[in-house]
From Swiss-Prot:
Pfam families: SHMT (PF00464). PROSITE patterns: SHMT. Signal peptide: none annotated. Homodimer. NCBIfam families: PRK00011.1. It comes from Helicobacter pylori (strain G27). GO terms for biological process: glycine biosynthetic process from serine; tetrahydrofolate interconversion. PANTHER family: SERINE HYDROXYMETHYLTRANSFERASE. Belongs to the SHMT family. The modification N6-(pyridoxal phosphate)lysine is found at K226. It comes from the Bacteria. This is Serine hydroxymethyltransferase.
Length: 416
């Protein structure tokens, strides 16, 4: 197949092929990454990238938006059907942009946010001091108990003490389900709004493999990639008409200018894929594969945060190990397994070193790997960690896993 890019920029073309080779030969186990649908990539590479469309369908500031109005309207309707809600904004460029737009819509400067502590699994946009949310608003955090589960009683006490305007329930590294009903009870107790950030578990939510944030949350944000397997982007959902109007204004003109119409089209394509029966089977596989992996690691006496997992990810705990999350990340990377170092509850090391790693099952499940492969992977992870400085072992495992990976090709071509 001939590519224009090969003729116009051979350097980038060759690097894309290099990454294509890496994605095919390595085991991608970063919990926030996934392999999107080829149809999604086709939409993203379309002529829609040429069109500016500031505003919303039938309320644009530019002409020539007749077609993109239809595309965005289709994306909105599919999102509403997928998440069973009344209002959807599909313009957010990312999950962080979606969260910031929610705050911009519903809060005043220096209002109070209560979100999950970063070391317990929260996200930067849930009030971390280094984030805009930690600078523009007063941020407070709740955490987990000694068992690694969210401490709802502590969260209630903190909420009663600080009286936040908004409570955020969601995570980037928490291996258990969120109890949205309990969080709503806490929010109602203190008169707060409830934002459900389901960026990580959206694909499980829409297939009934995780509790649904509605009707408990006033507003819901998510990314469209991760477990949804759509394009990189964000969405905001609600059943409240007044909140929906504020959200729309907060996205445009509040925090963004022109929407990315090629990405919005890709979101629509992804939502259609998510509505298919095959996607339900995929979500079940994501969860069952993670259970197999957790079991394999526990049988080898590896410590997991909360003792296991109820979703698509797990956290390994190295607090009592001589090696760090960074060490494990590097060693596993050398063996062809891509994970990420991650802070964990009770963290004693810096965020650049950490005492844990986060592992996800979404990407390898998308390749069609199942219980057999995940048991093998669990055993190989254990072998590497138990002899973490053995470089020759790492290289040997890399070749073994490369052979397995080649049985489950990601794509037939790198550019769509």
């Amino acid at each position: 197949m001939a590519y224009f890019l090969e003729q116009t920029d051979s350097e980038i073309f060759e690097l894309i092929f290099e990454e294509y080779k890496r994605q095919n030969e390595h085991l991608e186990m970063i919990a926030s990454e996934n392999y999107t649908f080829p149809s999604v990539m086709e939409a993203m590479g379309s002529i829609l990238t040429n069109k500016y469309a500031e505003g919303y369908p039938n309320k644009r500031y530019y002409g020539g938006c007749e077609v993109v109005d239809k595309i965005e309207s289709l994306a909105i309707e599919r999102a509403k059907k997928l998440f069973n809600c009344q209002f959807a904004n599909v313009q957010a460029h990312s999950g962080s942009q979606a969260n910031n737009a929610v705050y911009h819509a519903l809060l005043k400067p220096y209002d109070k946010i209560l979100g999950m502590d970063l070391s317990c699994g929260g996200h930067l946009t849930h009030g971390a001091k280094v984030s805009l949310t930690g600078k523009h608003y007063q941020s407070f955090s709740y955490g987990v108990n000694l068992d690694g589960y969210i401490d709802y009683e502590e969260a209630l006490k903190i909420a009663q003490s600080v009286k936040p305007e908004i409570i955020v329930c969601g995570f980037s590294a928490y291996p258990r389900e969120i109890d949205f009903k309990k969080f709503r009870e806490i929010a109602d107790e203190v008169g707060a709004l409830l934002l459900g950030d389901i960026a990580h578990v959206a694909g499980l939510v829409v297939t009934n493999e995780h509790a649904h944030p509605f009707p408990h949350c006033h507003v819901v944000s998510s990314t469209t990639h991760k477990t949804l397997r759509g394009p990189r982007g964000g969405i905001i959902l609600t059943n409240d008409e007044e909140i929906a109007a504020k959200i729309d204004k907060a996205i445009f003109p509040g925090t963004q200018g022109g929407p990315l119409m090629h990405v919005i089209a890709a979101k629509a394509v992804g939502f259609k894929e998510n509505l298919k029966p095959e996607f339900k089977a995929y979500a079940k596989l994501v969860k069952s594969n993670m259970q197999v992996l957790a079991k394999a690691l526990k049988e080898k006496n590896h410590k997991l945060v909360s003792g296991g997992t109820s979703n698509h990810l797990l956290l390994m705990d190295f607090l009592d190990k001589p090696y760090s999350g960074k060490d494990a990340d590097i060693a596993l990377g050398n063996a062809g397994i891509t994970v990420n170092k991650n802070t964990i509850p009770g963290e004693t090391r810096s965020p650049f070193v950490t005492s844990g790693i986060r592992i996800g099952s979404a990407a390898l499940s998308a390749r069609g790997m199942g219980a057999k492969e995940f048991e093998i992977i669990g055993n190989k992870i254990s072998d590497i960690l138990n002899d973490i400085n053995n470089v020759s072992l790492q290289l040997h495992v890399k070749e073994e896993l490369k052979a397995m990976a080649n049985q489950f090709p990601v794509y037939q071509q790198p550019i769509f």
